[in-house]
Amino acid sequence: MALIKSLLALLLGAFLLSAGTSHLGSNRTEFLAQVPTWLPLDPDFVVIASGLVEITLGALLIITALILKKYRGVIGVITAVFFILIFPGNINQYVNHLDAFGLDTDTKRFIRLLFQPPLVALALWCSDGLSLLKKLKQI
């Protein structure tokens, strides 16, 4: 099971590295569509900042899967929290019928919403973040 968790952490890390990099380049305009208009920050700043956070978390997931294993749970919890914090962007895209990333119908945008909870769960499970949260709850 430890091998499967490590492989999934590596895959999630690679996914975040790729997504974060695309925030800064090829898909920047697409990501702008997800920034809620009620957010009191410059949308371009939000896209760049979230991209840098994704790159950082992706790298840390990979590093903690391979070598700094004692920090895996902490990085997993932080990644899960990040996924929760960016969820309003996905909701914004759905509610306001915004086309981006090929999500050009409400059905596609709704299906995309369904992927966020499993991403949160994956971040917690593959990093042993759930175990860390259980330990913290006992304190």
Task: List the model feature ranges, each with a label.
Residues M1-I139:
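Membrane-interface extramembranous regions
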